[in-house]
């Protein structure tokens, strides 16, 4: 296989010049369209319609080495989607969850499936369940997987005094959204005054309710999930997240830390722990009806019991956690990861 040399940057990868001579390669007779992520009109807000963005040009340069026809497509209207269907690509590579066209909401992966076009991630119903942290936790509980006690609180419906079903301290974060948005040094609250303040802050900044849950004091892990293209079986890729203590002495994976990329991921070397994390992650992914790829976050309590935190069925495909899980556990580079994901998309539709 011809390799593209890549250089790691803050947000992902860029191409490096290579002196490798050109090698003639027989390409796979498949057509792939990479959808360009729509530019947000509200860059500071949470874009629920987007699961992840990618460097479309880099993805194209990787895929064109293996597949005969690879193109980048911008979707701005329902008519653009209809034209895509007429072109009938074998696979659409996209991090878009849904489009809003004149008040018509179209979930991309379901639309593609209805038109017999392969895609790389999960269905509309499952993405909706995953993005709402409370719904996801309810599904996890029904599957008899351990997760922290929690409740949803709306700032505009919050009574002057109410009793929590769990003792302080508690952890507070937005009900929807990923990438630790809304998580900061004030997310661990120890009394009712702090709780109300944090809930109101989340409502003001993200226009959504808060999920309040038991604070877990132990280590945090993330587990990448990739399906085997031949059998459909799940491969779990655990990694421990090394987090520095904040001013309060807590190890909180907050938005600022993720944005500045100051946390570290390391391989889980303890076999027993590896298997426990892998088992919980695979069961969680299955319960949430994930497809092809995903990421499950797990945190220990003070008794070293693992708890499901949340799931991401459309994990970022730049240089983030999912890639690092693949690199640590499978010893593959970014190019190989992208090719596996595409092969998954083309193959899993037949399983």
Show where each model-derived region lies.
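ATP-binding N-terminal substructure of ATP-dependent carboxylate-amine bond-forming enzymes
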Residues: 1-119, 125, 135, 154-162, ...
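Active-site nucleotide/adenylate-binding loops and adjacent lid/helix of ATP-dependent enzymes
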Residues: 13-20, 25-36, 85-88, 128-211, ...
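A short, flexible beta-alpha/helix-coil linker loop
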Residues: 39-43, 177-179, 262
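Short acidic, glycine/proline-rich loop/turn micro-motifs
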Residues: 43-47, 182-184, 321-324
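Conserved strand-to-helix beginnings and helix N-cap segments that scaffold or border functional pockets
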Residues: 105-106, 133, 320-323
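Phosphate-binding site of ATP-dependent enzymes
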Residues: 192-273, 279, 300, 305-307
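ATP-dependent carboxylate activation and anion-phosphoryl transfer catalytic cores
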Residues: 271-351
């Amino acid at each position: 296989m011809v390799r593209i040399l890549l250089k790691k940057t803050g947000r992902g990868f860029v191409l490096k010049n290579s002196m490798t001579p050109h090698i003639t390669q027989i390409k796979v007779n498949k057509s792939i369209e990479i959808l360009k992520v729509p530019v947000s009109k509200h860059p500071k807000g949470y874009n629920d319609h987007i699961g992840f963005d990618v460097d479309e040009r880099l993805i194209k340069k990787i895929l064109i080495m293996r597949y005969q026809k690879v193109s980048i497509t911008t979707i701005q209207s329902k008519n653009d989607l209809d034209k895509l269907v007429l072109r009938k690509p074998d696979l659409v590579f996209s991090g878009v969850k849904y489009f809003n066209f004149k008040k018509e909401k179209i979930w991309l992966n379901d639309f593609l499936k209805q038109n017999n076009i392969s895609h790389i991630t999960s269905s509309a119903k499952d993405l909706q369940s995953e993005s709402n942290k409370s719904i996801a936790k309810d599904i996890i509980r029904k599957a008899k997987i351990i997760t922290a006690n929690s409740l949803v609180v709306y700032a505009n419906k919050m009574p002057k005094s109410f009793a929590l079903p769990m003792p302080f301290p508690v952890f507070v974060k937005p009900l929807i959204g990923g990438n630790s948005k809304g998580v900061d040094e004030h997310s661990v609250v120890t009394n009712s005054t702090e709780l109300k303040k944090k809930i109101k802050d989340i409502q003001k900044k993200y226009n959504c309710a808060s999920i309040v849950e038991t604070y877990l004091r132990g280590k945090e892990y993330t587990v990448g999930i990739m399906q085997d293209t031949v059998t459909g079986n799940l491969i779990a890729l655990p990694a421990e997240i090394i987090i520095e203590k904040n001013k309060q002495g807590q190890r909180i994976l907050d938005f600022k830390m993720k944005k500045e990329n100051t946390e570290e991921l390391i391989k889980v070397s303890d076999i027993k722990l590896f298997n426990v994390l892998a088992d919980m992650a695979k069961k969680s992914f299955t319960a949430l009806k994930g497809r092809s790829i995903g990421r499950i976050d797990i945190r220990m309590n003070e008794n070293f019991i693992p708890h499901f935190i949340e799931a991401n069925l459309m994990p970022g495909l730049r240089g983030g956690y999912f890639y690092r899980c693949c690199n640590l556990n499978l010893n593959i580079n970014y190019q190989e990861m992208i090719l596996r994901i595409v092969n998954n998309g083309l193959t899993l539709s037949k399983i």
